[in-house]
Amino acid sequence: IGFITTPSILAFSKREIAISKKNYKAFLLADAESGRILYQDRIYENNYPASLVKMMVALITIEEINSGRISLNDNVIISSWASKIGGHQVYLKQGEKFKLSELMKATIIGSANDAAVAIAEHVYGSVKVFIKKMNSRAKELGMLKTSFYSVHGLPPGKNQKIDVSSAYDFYLLALEVLKHPKFLQWSSTRLDSFRKGTFQLLNTNHRLIKSYHGMQGMKTGYHRKAGFNLVSTAIRKGQRFISIVLGAKNSRIRQKITRFLLDYGFENFKKYDLNYIGESISLSAKIEGGTVGSVPLKVAKSVRILLSDIERKKLRILPKIPIKTKAPIKANQNLGNLEYWLNDKMLKKVHLQTEFEVPKQNILFVITEMFTNLNETN
């Protein structure tokens, strides 16, 4: 999905805060609509996601809700095991009953580990089965560096394995999660309540949600080995970016790098309207055996591409049209493509269509043409 470009580091050196490789393990900035990666460092290296794993918990649960197998209104009875999970929690007690919607809020907004376990047990009957589904779903998404061993992301206990992933893999997961508005509704909520208002849920990303215009989450993660992680998304005037920071030294650096990346996106890239649906272009296709020798072409759909000003100047639009096409040809028939290239990467491809119908020559047409040509020569 998408491709990688690397702007000059000078683009960041002029900023107030320099990004130092000592302060983080990986970062990534991507355009959410096209999937194009705009800036990155060490995105394929193995890292520990910590609580970012709850993004996969949320995705699987939302997909099961959408399938109709479960509902946000389901009552979830808390097990003994879920009540014993430590770290970030909402202090669930064995035998308590909560709506699945409440536990989803606690997991996404408050990063509650006990709520994540309760959700997993409800959805598939056991945490073990849920983790198996997490790994199979990761494989489907192309998350090749990812191995999940928990639903909460806590440091492993004795004889347990630690969750492993990469910035690139969580970029793939973020793209999939963004297909579900309900997740953003939760992840962009700064403050909510739990247990009938007796417990407050403060978003673990509350500082950026409050201070960064357009911020909508998505998920924080931390433990000592992992460092400070954040998958975030922000939208302004219809333009959405995804930012990923892994292994930051502290939460302050995590926030600053996130601001860097998102600011870089919003300040340096914009969508260019390059072609419009039905737009005629100065190209035609040669037709063999038709009532005319060629047919003009038009663009099948509108084309908008996110580019920097410099990239716009470098963009090449290349037509790919068959040398000859045999009649008959229908009106609005796909006949070739326009390809939009930046350096050695194709950003987009759109079909070209015929402006009108071109019937096949018949005997009457051939005779008529012969007499016409004779009259013209006499």
What do these predicted ranges mean?
Residues 1-4:
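Bacterial N-terminal signal peptides
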Residues 8-9, 311:
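Compositionally biased non-globular segments, especially hydrophobic aliphatic-rich helices
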Residues 9-172, 177-181:
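Active-site-adjacent loops and short helices of periplasmic peptidoglycan-processing enzymes
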Residues 143, 161-378:
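Domain-terminus/edge residues, biased toward the C-terminal soluble/receptor-binding domains
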